[in-house]
Amino acid sequence: TTMPFTLVTDAMVGFNPDEEYVYVSVGSETWIIGKIRLEEFMKEAKMEDYKVLKTVKGSEFEGKKYTHPLLGNISGLEKMSKQENYHITIAEKFVDVNAGTGIVHLSPANGEDDYNIAMKRKVEIFSPIDDEVKFTEDAGKYAGMFVRDADEEIVRDVKEKNALVRIGKIKHKYPLCWRSQHKLVWLARREYFYMLDRLGDKAINAAQKVEYFFDQPKNRFLKIIKEKHPWCISRERFWGCPLPIWKCTECENIERLFSRKEIVDMADDLPDGPNFELHRPWIDKISIKCKKCNAKMQREEFVLDTWHNSGAAPFASLSDDEYEKTIPAPFFTEGIDQTRGWAYTLLIENVIFNNKAISPYNSFLFQGHVLDEKGNKMSKSTGNVLDAADLLDKYPVDLV
């Protein structure tokens, strides 16, 4: 792994079922390594004295239990490991045998592919990480540490357990915040989603009726629509349109309240009266009595994805009569990046609201981006933007 902190949330180890793996005798130990990587890996580990004992298919490792070396340090993980389907080896075709040992550890709390495998196999997600991205008490020895700050200590602990074969530095891609350039940490969080596969082919059928003027942006947009990737509509922020969902603190019953009147009619307590401010923190003070168990219901403290707001523009800003007369609009235009932004949310929400293959626009022109001298997108945060006013002082307007 290139992220030692993910050993705290380790759940499975993956082998490629179609590839060969070798059992290798190294001193008093037996190692398992992908056959393709054996010679190169042993050179990297500076191991010359070893012997191949046998060769097996990756599929043979499906369902075997293994012992995590740091269980004594991580109380929550030690409890999880007692589950039948936890800390087992699995055989999955996504495993890349051309890097490392040809074997990968899976941390469902810190990676999308790992998470999807866990969901498919009904493996519980262990995520002892709080809102400040620090380990909680369930992380045992590492509690209170920012997860990336725990990397070095975890490596030292693995070494002390005589479980470290090799450590080194490699150059690889890593996700960064597009504004601050800080390293990002992937976390499995409880959120709200639109499960777009439930729309069937309505969205793609609607998108195919639109004129895009050029094939490249058209093909890019249609490919994204065809993915039917779940859309996370909730955000863990303070500013924004509050998610209008109340959840029971006891039985977890859910109420969806889409108007001020519905909230007032069901409210158990209105601290600011019936004309309360609809945003946070005021709306968070309102409690509702659960219809099922009479316990207290509290609003889910999420706001909506701001793209949800912009995607709802035709419905939110027009009366029913105005909508019928003006939608679908004859023409929209935006930057090419809006294939995953406004163009996407406008179309998806229009299909959802109508429950039909109806686009909110008849044509959409995706414009290209002006790039800097290195071919990178211009960005104010990066500081590589050219001021059009300065250019117009030097060059003809039609050229600019």
Predicted regions and their residues:
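Protease-associated
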Residues: T6-F15, E19-I103, E112
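Short active-site loop/helix that positions an aromatic residue
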Residues: T2-D18, V24, E40-A45, D114-V123, ...
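Short acidic-glycine loop/turn motifs at beta-strand connectors
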Residues: P17, S25-E29, D130-D131, K247-N253, ...
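Short amphipathic beta-strand/extended segments with alternating polar/hydrophobic composition
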Residues: T1-T2, T30-F41, G76-S81, L187, ...
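Residue patterns forming the tRNA-binding/recognition surfaces of aminoacyl-tRNA synthetases
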Residues: T1-V8, Y21, G63-T67, F94-F258, ...
